[in-house]
């Protein structure tokens, strides 16, 4: 009996001891989980604009893939889940940070002007905006060669492995996602879709597909399988390219197999700008990094913080300075011409990062928003209202990071479909419509091989001293730069958590210098800005389509957030 009692006591003590060991080990092996707070990850994360694509990117990382591998896999997925935004018929810009070397590079695979194009193209701009449907607007797709170049330089897993999750998604009974159904049934888009070759993909008889309807897309599944097995060249110099060109020629396209074969992505150095304790790395023209850098460079001189904004009138004062800075920024968009086709632009765009220019702009900002004519800001008054695009942010276990923005331009691009390849074509040449130099009444014609200007700003901010990193970018056409700039301000200057920084309603300044407010934007701030002479746009856009995806690393903690405006959800571990 005594022996049995002693044995029981020993077993209890052994159990308690083992429990303590487990607790201690858990505390030693995973101290970060407790200190980082709920919702944080401790190793890596992916933020795409849908949960399923974020999960696919995370799975690639867990299979020991590189951040570039994860970004490619998530982008391939997004081309299926949100085909209105991006796909193989579009273009992509990567900003890539290598933690082992500390180097950042840009891979620009944005679409180019084909060798032959409609010579009267730019004369059509006023009549086709904002959508720009039709084969005459198609640029040479660069998406897939962009993936191939990024994978060649930074990939770790086999190429085919990056496509398998999305192929399985298509083969196993894919259904229409909610966000796609919203676009398909949009009152503006629906008539154009019905009249286009996309009708065969997105309509069931006379009705558009609804959320959770079966969505068979065998042509794209076949294309992805072929690309997975044979590589990107099958689209650029092989049979898929020939099929694509033949399909869209029937719809008026002038794109040729020679255009596809000639396309090459560019690998260039990023724009680099100090921002407090961070360094901002962003893509140079024709992408929009120079404009984003200009905005933040001007605003950082006003030293806005949570404390200054909390003072009476502080929030209105910050947004007033933001609005005035955005007016100047919109007036500088002409600097985003492609420097490869217009060499004189390169230095002009880099001037936007100069501190003396930022200081001069600050001195021109006073307490009123109605003291100056449009010419003071170089504003043209030409309204754009462009929208579209998708973004993925990735942080790997070693601290390497990728920000990748991809697009077919406006929703559903040119609304031109290749039924044999399953590819939707871009309408990227529409972006040439706002290539205007305020000092000249003449806009030079497009140059074959030229990349149109873009608002895409896949960016990485690095604070090496504190081990912090913000990987960020967005979608929403002309709203991208406004949304990304305000998210960075919210996070780094005002101390918002990442989800709140992204979710906060934004404002935007159009080319008339008028302010557009996202629904639910603070009414008191709106009133305060009006009292300062800021003019609210009378033609409010029907919907704000801005969507930011970001990953933030702070020491051992990793936070990731995808924009709920597009029903996004990040994933990590």
From Swiss-Prot:
GO cellular component, one term: plasma membrane
Location(s), subcellular: Membrane
Residue ranges, Extracellular side: 30-573
PTM description: Cleaved by autocatalysis into a large and a small subunit. Glycosylated.
Binding site for L-glutamate: 110, 407, 428, 454-455
Paired cysteines (S-S): none
Cytoplasmic side of membrane: 1-8
Active-site residues, record numbering mapped to chain: 389 (nucleophile)
Tissue expr: Very low level of expression. Detected in spleen lymphocytes, medullary and paracortical thymic lymphocytes, lung interstitial cells, bronchial epithelium, proximal tubules in kidney, crypt cells in small intestine, neurons in brain stem and cerebral cortex and in Purkinje cells.
A Pfam family reported for this protein in Swiss-Prot or TrEMBL: G_glu_transpept
Membrane topology category: Single-pass type II membrane protein
Sugar-bearing residue positions: 98, 185, 204, 277, 303, 347, 378
Catalytic activities: glutathione + H2O = L-cysteinylglycine + L-glutamate; an S-substituted glutathione + H2O = an S-substituted L-cysteinylglycine + L-glutamate; leukotriene C4 + H2O = leukotriene D4 + L-glutamate; S-[(2E,6E,10E)-geranylgeranyl]-L-glutathione + H2O = S-[(2E,6E,10E)-geranylgeranyl]-L-cysteinylglycine + L-glutamate
EC number: 3.4.19.13, 2.3.2.2, 3.4.19.14
Family the UniProt entry places it in: Belongs to the gamma-glutamyltransferase family.
Assembly mode: Heterodimer composed of the light and heavy chains. The active site is located in the light chain.
Record-linked PANTHER family: GAMMA-GLUTAMYLTRANSFERASE 5, PUTATIVE GLUTATHIONE HYDROLASE LIGHT CHAIN
Function field: Cleaves the gamma-glutamyl bond of extracellular glutathione tripeptide (gamma-Glu-Cys-Gly) and certain glutathione conjugates. Hydrolyzes glutathione releasing L-Glu and Cys-Gly dipeptide which is further metabolized to maintain extracellular cysteine levels but also to provide cysteine necessary for intracellular glutathione synthesis. Among glutathione-S-conjugates metabolizes leukotriene C4 (LTC4) and S-geranylgeranyl-glutathione (GGG), but is inactive toward gamma-glutamyl leucine. Converts extracellular LTC4 to LTD4 during acute inflammatory response.
Name of the protein: Glutathione hydrolase 5 proenzyme
Annotated organism of origin: Mus musculus (Mouse)
Gene name as annotated: Ggt5
């Amino acid at each position: 009996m005594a022996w049995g009692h002693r044995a029981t006591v020993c077993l209890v003590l052994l159990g308690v001891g083992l429990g303590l060991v487990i607790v201690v080990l858990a505390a030693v092996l995973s101290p970060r989980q407790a200190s980082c707070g709920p919702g944080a990850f401790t190793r890596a994360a992916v933020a795409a604009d849908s949960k399923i694509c974020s999960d696919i990117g995370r799975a690639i990382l867990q299979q020991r893939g590189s951040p570039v591998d994860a970004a490619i896999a998530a982008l391939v997925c997004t081309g299926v889940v949100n085909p209105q935004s991006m796909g193989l018929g579009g273009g992509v810009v990567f900003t890539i940070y290598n933690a082992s070397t500390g180097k950042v590079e840009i891979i620009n695979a944005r679409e180019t002007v084909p060798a032959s194009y409609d010579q009267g193209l730019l004369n059509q701009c006023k009549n086709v905006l904002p959508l720009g449907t039709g084969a005459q607007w198609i640029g040479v797709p660069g998406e897939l060669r962009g993936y191939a170049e990024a994978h060649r330089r930074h990939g770790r897993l086999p190429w085919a492995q990056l496509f398998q999750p999305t192929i399985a998604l298509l083969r196993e009974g894919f259904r229409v996602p909610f966000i796609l159904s919203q676009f398909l049934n949009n009152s503006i888009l629906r008539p154009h879709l019905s009249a286009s070759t996309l009708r065969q993909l997105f309509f069931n008889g006379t009705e558009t597909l609804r959320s959770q309807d079966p969505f068979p897309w065998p042509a794209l599944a076949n294309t992805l399988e072929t690309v997975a097995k044979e590589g990107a060249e099958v689209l650029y110099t092989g049979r898929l390219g020939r099929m694509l060109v033949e399909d869209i020629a029937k719809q008026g396209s002038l794109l040729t197999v020679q255009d596809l074969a000639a396309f090459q992505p560019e690998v260039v150095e990023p724009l680099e700008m100090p921002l407090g304790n961070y360094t901002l790395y962003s893509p140079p023209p024709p992408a929009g990094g120079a404009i984003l850098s200009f905005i933040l460079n001007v605003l950082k001189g006003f030293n806005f913080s949570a404390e200054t904004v909390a003072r009476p009138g502080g929030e209105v004062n910050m947004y007033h300075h933001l609005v005035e800075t955005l007016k100047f920024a919109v007036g500088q968009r002409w600097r985003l011409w492609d420097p490869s086709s217009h060499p004189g632009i390169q230095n002009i765009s880099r001037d936007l990062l100069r501190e003396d220019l930022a200081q001069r702009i600050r001195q021109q900002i006073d307490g009123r928003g109605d003291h100056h004519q449009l010419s003071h800001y170089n504003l043209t008054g030409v309204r754009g209202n462009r929208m579209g695009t998708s973004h993925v942010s990735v942080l790997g276990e070693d601290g390497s990071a990728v920000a990748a923005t991809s697009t077919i331009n406006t929703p559903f691009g040119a609304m031109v479909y290749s039924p044999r390849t399953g590819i939707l074509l871009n309408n990227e040449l529409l972006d040439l419509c706002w290539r205007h130099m305020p000092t000249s009444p003449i806009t030079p014609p497009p140059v074959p091989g030229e990349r149109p200007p873009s608002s895409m700003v896949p960016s990485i901010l690095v604070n090496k001293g504190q081990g912090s990193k913000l990987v960020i970018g967005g979608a929403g056409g002309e709203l991208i730069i406004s949304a990304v700039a305000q998210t960075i301000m919210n996070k780094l200057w005002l101390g918002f958590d990442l989800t709140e920084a992204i979710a906060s309603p934004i404002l935007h300044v159009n080319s008339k210098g008028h302010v557009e407010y996202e629904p639910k934007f603070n009414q008191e701030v709106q009133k305060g800005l009006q009292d300062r002479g800021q003019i609210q746009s009378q033609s409010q856009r029907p919907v704000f389509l801005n969507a930011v995806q970001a990953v933030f690393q702070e020491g051992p903690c990793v936070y990731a957030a995808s924009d709920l405006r597009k029903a996004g959800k990040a994933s990590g571990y």
